[in-house]
């Protein structure tokens, strides 16, 4: 499905927003039946020290066999997997909600809203890593 074919009810900008907070609100709204597009996924952030975050993602990448489980490396796919983890994905309702969510690197839409209480400004500490940096360290091809 191309950018033009997805008619989103809501376009959310994830730039400098905390991944988990945005993902939980996206999941909740998708369950309510809204069609949601999230833009600038590569600029969303994960809080914590860079070493700790990268250790978690590297362990995830090393565990398993050639047959799986496989984990995403691209920022948009990491974001989408986070949203999926917050949905009852194995039920019909959850799967339909998941189909109504699109995640984009960059911004193919004219305007986007920023969700309340998801901004990086609310942090008392300054330790965070962007999804783009995580993806680069995992070996993703940098196209953003």
From Swiss-Prot:
Where is it found, in Gene Ontology cellular component terms?
cytosolic large ribosomal subunit
Q: Which domain of life is it from?
A: Archaea
UniProt KW keywords: Ribonucleoprotein, Ribosomal protein
Has the keyword Oxidoreductase been applied to this entry? no
Q: Which GO terms describe its molecular function?
A: mRNA binding; structural constituent of ribosome
Please name one Pfam family that this protein belongs to. Answer: Ribosomal_L13
Q: Which GO terms describe its biological process?
A: negative regulation of translation; translation
Quaternary structure annotation from Swiss-Prot or TrEMBL: Part of the 50S ribosomal subunit.
Its function, per the record, reads: This protein is one of the early assembly proteins of the 50S ribosomal subunit, although it is not seen to bind rRNA by itself. It is important during the early stages of 50S assembly.
Which HAMAP family does the entry link to? Answer: Ribosomal_uL13 (MF_01366)
- Record-stated family: Belongs to the universal ribosomal protein uL13 family.
Identify this protein by name: Large ribosomal subunit protein uL13
Q: Which organism is it from?
A: Natronomonas pharaonis (strain ATCC 35678 / DSM 2160 / CIP 103997 / JCM 8858 / NBRC 14720 / NCIMB 2260 / Gabara)
């Amino acid at each position: 499905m191309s950018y033009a074919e997805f008619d989103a009810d809501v376009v959310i900008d994830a730039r400098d927003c905390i991944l988990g907070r945005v993902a939980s609100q996206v999941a909740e709204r998708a369950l309510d039946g809204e069609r949601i597009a999230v833009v600038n996924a590569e600029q969303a952030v994960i809080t914590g020290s860079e070493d700790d975050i990268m250790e978690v993602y590297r362990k995830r990448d090393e565990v398993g066999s050639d047959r799986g489980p496989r984990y995403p490396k691209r920022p948009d796919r990491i974001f989408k997997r986070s949203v999926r983890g917050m949905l009852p994905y194995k039920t019909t309702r959850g799967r339909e909600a998941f189909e109504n969510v699109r995640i984009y690197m960059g911004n193919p839409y004219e305007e986007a809203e920023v969700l309340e209480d998801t901004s990086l400004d609310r942090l008392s500490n300054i330790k965070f890593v962007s999804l783009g940096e995580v993806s680069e360290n995992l070996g993703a091809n940098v196209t953003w």
